[in-house]
Amino acid sequence: MASRKNQNIAIPLCLPNNCRWNAATGKYIKTGRQRTSLYVVEEALKKLKTVKGPVCVVSIAGPYRKGKSYILSEAFDQPEVFPLGHHFDPETVGIWMWIVPQKMRDSTGRECTVVLLDSEGIDAVMGEGLDDNQIFTLTVLLASVLIYNSAGVPTRHDLNGLDFIMKLSQRIRLCSNDGSVSASSPREDTEFFHKTFPFFIWLLRDVTQSIPTDCRDIKEYFLTRVFKDQGKERAD
């Protein structure tokens, strides 16, 4: 059982179907059922409906137990809105939401509401691949800005997570406003893709090693080492 009684902390946007949320008590419990899907929490939808004007959704994803909740809270000066765990098992299940009370301005000066989404960490020992895929898919599709949080030097496993995002983008059919399949040109589809999918940030944490001497900066390292087979377009 986990308690969320404080009004100044996040609530679940969606939970696994083996968890039940009680808005009156601010708690969720695990029912003992097998986890097979996610469901939307009605209280979170009600809170979202109160938001007026432009919205920027900032989501964070990555391996479990690597400090995602802490980073997301601190980056937007919203301390302790996402609960922090101190055990092997993950603290966050499903996707949790916090609406930043203060309005912010984007790069164009437009005022907007920032919604923070903290997602369940991938690769938990008690989790399954289907769970990770469901969480990762929703995190990508809901985000305006997606932060991928990893610790240490990038690994092949990190790339597998990014490869999932690329495959997801290839599977989604771009549709016109009326719901019919778009007959637009490849260039128009690419432009629409960049408007639809989130701005991506790979957050490298706790990296004490220096980049190779033949690389001018971290971007060149990614292009020549990490994404050498995918090319510059994929790295961007």
Can you annotate each of these PLM segments?
Residues M1-D236:
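Conserved GTPase G-domain substructure that encodes guanine base recognition and part of the catalytic core
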